[in-house]
């Protein structure tokens, strides 16, 4: 509790009480009663606060205070009251006439608590210590089980994380699981096919050709867009020979080819074929010396899906894109240089329109 306001207004004494102060307080309360404790110091002529006078009277100067040690009956009563009220010492003291709360608290902490422990009784719960320890031992396994269950709940996520790490750390080469052909880019810019017969065992059975009901496309489709890029007006460009710009609308041709050996790739530097399990990798030559190939032929990259192939006699599917550059080659000196004023705006407008037409025609054709 905080001090009364009178303690801050004037200088009051603190500490031990002198015999003269005890006599003044005892005489005043005996003759007039204590009344309001805040007014007692002024009426008794003491330089003390009201709280100090009250505590001095209750704990030391009361005529009904019992002096001496506590009897065994009082100790047993204190134990019974503590089991019901706990550490409420003032309420316990009200049940023991002539005893103060301070005396009871000191007796509890000094002697009664030790006696209860020697008897095997917990001073806090007033139960046998064996029961309290067994109860605490039962709580420990439950907490450990909760921790284990929490770890068990976390284990699937960790295992899923390990599974994700297993797949994420693998190289993203789908050719090991599907019928994609691998390409070896040599120094002469030739492309050769390297197949591995051991990859057939890694393909799931649902993706095997025998289990497929039908082929996605029964006949091969060859999409051949022909695009003519406009030349620039710069005289130093090898593609720009004049002020004319010739554009060819995209021409999408759909044709079927019933012969594997008559396609476009037989006369150039591409040796592409559907992976055949009967042919081993030793029959395919990895390195070939090819003739000069046009730049537009390097863009012809067929994309095979092994799961859509029904048998060895099914026809290949490839997309053939050719880009024709129509320009006057008489003044070719520098490739792909653009005019700063007219070339960029004209070509960008033409290309955007041309690409829109290509997208529309390609969507309608497929």
UniProtKB/Swiss-Prot annotation:
It comes from the Eukaryota. It is found in: Nucleus. PANTHER family: MYB DOMAIN PROTEIN 55, TRANSCRIPTION FACTOR MYB61. The keyword Disulfide bond does not apply. InterPro entries: Homeodomain-like_sf, Myb_dom, Plant_SW-associated_TFs, SANT/Myb. The keyword NAD does not apply. Residues 9-61, 62-116 form the HTH myb-type domain. Expressed specifically in guard cells. Expressed in sink tissues, such as xylem, roots and developing seeds. Pfam families: Myb_DNA-binding. Disruption phenotype: Increased stomatal pore opening. Reduced amount of seed mucilage. Early germination, slow growth, delayed flowering and senescence. Residues 115-164 are annotated as: Disordered. One of its GO terms (biological process) is xylem development. One of its GO terms (cellular component) is nucleus. Transcription factor that coordinates a small network of downstream target genes required for several aspects of plant growth and development, such as xylem formation and xylem cell differentiation, and lateral root formation. Regulates a specific set of target genes by binding DNA to the AC cis-element 5'-ACCTAC-3'. Functions as a transcriptional regulator of stomatal closure. Plays a role the regulation of stomatal pore size independently of abscisic acid (ABA). Required for seed coat mucilage deposition during the development of the seed coat epidermis. Keywords: Developmental protein, DNA-binding, Nucleus, Repeat, Transcription, Transcription regulation. This is Transcription factor MYB61. One of its GO terms (molecular function) is DNA-binding transcription factor activity. Residues 124-141 have a biased composition (Basic and acidic residues).
């Amino acid at each position: 509790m905080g001090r009364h306001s009178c303690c801050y207004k004037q200088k009051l004494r603190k500490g031990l009480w002198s015999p003269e102060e005890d006599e003044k307080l005892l005489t005043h309360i005996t003759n007039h009663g204590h009344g309001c404790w805040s007014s007692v110091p002024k009426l008794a002529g003491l330089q003390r606060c009201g709280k100090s006078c009250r505590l001095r009277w209750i704990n030391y100067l009361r005529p009904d205070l019992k002096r001496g040690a506590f009897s065994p009956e009082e100790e047993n009563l204190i134990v019974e009251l503590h089991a019901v009220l706990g550490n409420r010492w003032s309420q316990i003291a009200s049940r023991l006439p002539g005893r103060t709360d301070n005396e009871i608290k000191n007796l509890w902490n000094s002697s009664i608590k030790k006696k209860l422990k020697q008897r095997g009784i917990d001073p806090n719960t007033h139960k046998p210590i064996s029961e309290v320890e067994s109860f605490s031992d039962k709580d420990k396994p439950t907490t450990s089980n909760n921790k284990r269950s929490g770890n068990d709940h976390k284990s699937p996520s960790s295992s899923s994380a390990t599974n994700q790490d297993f797949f994420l750390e693998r190289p993203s080469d789908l050719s090991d699981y599907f019928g994609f052909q691998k390409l070896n880019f040599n120094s002469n810019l030739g492309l050769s096919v390297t197949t591995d017969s051991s990859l057939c065992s890694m393909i799931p059975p649902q993706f095997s050709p025998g289990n497929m009901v039908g082929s996605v496309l029964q006949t091969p489709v060859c999409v051949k867009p022909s695009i003519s890029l406009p030349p620039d007006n710069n005289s130093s460009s090898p593609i720009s020979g004049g002020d004319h710009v010739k554009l060819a609308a995209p021409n999408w041709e759909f044709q079927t080819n019933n012969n594997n050996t008559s396609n476009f790739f037989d006369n150039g530097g591409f040796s592409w074929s559907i992976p055949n399990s009967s042919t081993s990798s030793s029959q395919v030559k990895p390195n070939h010396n090819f003739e000069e190939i046009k730049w537009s032929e390097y863009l012809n990259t067929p994309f095979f899906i092994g799961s859509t192939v029904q048998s060895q006699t099914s026809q290949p599917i490839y997309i053939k894109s050719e880009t024709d550059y129509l320009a006057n080659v008489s003044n070719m000196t520098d490739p792909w240089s653009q005019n700063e004023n007219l070339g960029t705006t004209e070509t960008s407008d033409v290309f955007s329109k041309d690409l829109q037409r290509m997208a529309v025609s390609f969507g309608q054709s497929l």
